[in-house]
From Swiss-Prot:
It is found in: Cytoplasm. The gene is tal. The lineage of its organism: Bacteria, Pseudomonadati, Pseudomonadota, Gammaproteobacteria, Pseudomonadales. InterPro entries: Aldolase_TIM, TAL/FSA, Transaldolase_1, Transaldolase_AS. The active site is at K125. This is Transaldolase. Homodimer. Its main location: cytoplasm. Gene3D superfamilies: Aldolase class I. It comes from Pseudomonas entomophila (strain L48).
Length: 308
């Protein structure tokens, strides 16, 4: 029997949720994703010490540019060992400023292209705010493909699909966390609210012919991953990838095109904002996620300033 990881790869593109180059080289994912929290972790890895010094020297005290160059340099290194794409995140503090999101996305793409990496190997990650979705819609029309992250609600998924974004990252574990804390219950298998959220989105996209890729993210255990086997892509931490690699049990496909999905519904801005207002979990988790990424971005900036 092959491992659960190898079985999963037969019907789902496996993505590594890390900036750890050694882990990526060992686990051989197709794509990789990073975010400010993962970049902060990467900055503490001894193997990146020389890169930090080089970025410091190149940017001459420009902390904002130093953070961007570090993110792109980490991404460029990862692209040398994976066949697919790297997702690099825009500063979360810009999540409600469409023009600023567009400017930062263009800066990141320019840095990648200056490093000899074509834009078709990069996904720009944006928080799934209304402004982030609108920025993504414009970027897609320019040939810059996007990954909409911090996605917790069906309304966010609907708006992303209508905007024609390349890929969404609906979060599983953080939804699970909220419901577990709110109700005091343990959720297992198909009862998991995070699993149910991604399943509903996947079925809706397939039933309505959307091309947007569904990439489940934020997993707490391999049981959640097993319930979403068959999803277009899953981005998984190295720790859980190792667990899947070590498990020789059977892994059946759960998600498949052809399941019944809800009828298409397009949302305008006021409908989107009302739907978010009515979803306490999504509202809280989106705000919390943006705050956490913003704090880690600030820590990365402090590290760059200290290094300078």
């Amino acid at each position: 029997m092959t491992s659960k990881l190898e079985q999963l790869k037969q019907f789902t593109t496996v993505v590594a949720d890390t900036g750890d180059l050694d882990a990526i080289t060992r686990l051989k994912p197709v794509d990789a994703t990073t975010n400010p929290s993962l970049l902060l972790k990467a900055a503490a890895i001894p193997g990146y010490a020389d890169l930090l010094e080089q970025v410091k020297a190149d940017t001459k005290g420009n902390v904002d540019l130093a953070c961007d160059k570090f993110a792109v340099s980490v991404g460029a290194g990862i692209l040398k060992v994976i066949p697919g794409r790297i997702s690099t995140e825009v500063d979360a503090r810009l999540s409600f400023d469409e023009p600023a999101l567009l400017k930062k996305a263009h800066q990141l793409i320019e840095l990648y292209e200056a490093a000899g990496i074509k834009r078709d190997r990069v996904l720009i990650k944006l928080a799934s705010t209304w402004e982030g979705i609108r920025a993504a819609e414009k970027l897609e029309k320019e040939g810059i493909q996007t990954n909409l992250t911090l996605l917790f609600s069906f309304a966010q998924a609907q708006a992303c699909a209508d905007a024609g974004v390349f890929l969404i990252s609906p979060f599983v574990g953080r939804i699970y966390d909220w419901y577990k804390k709110s109700t005091g219950k343990e959720y297992i298998g198909a009862e998991d609210p995070g699993v149910q959220s991604v399943t509903r989105i996947y079925d809706y996209y397939k039933a309505n012919g959307y091309n947007t890729v569904v990439m489940g993210a934020s997993f707490r255990n391999i049981g959640q991953i097993e319930q979403l086997a068959g999803c277009d892509r899953l981005t998984i931490s190295p720790e859980l990838l190792v667990q899947l690699s070590d498990d020789q049990g059977e892994l059946p496909r759960i998600l498949k095109p052809g399941n019944a999905g809800e009828a298409k519904q397009q949302l305008n801005e006021s409908q989107f904002r009302w739907a978010m207002n009515e979803d306490a979990m999504a509202t809280e988790k989106l705000a919390e996620g943006i705050r956490q990424f913003a704090r880690d971005q600030e820590k990365l900036e402090a590290l760059m300033a200290d290094k300078a």
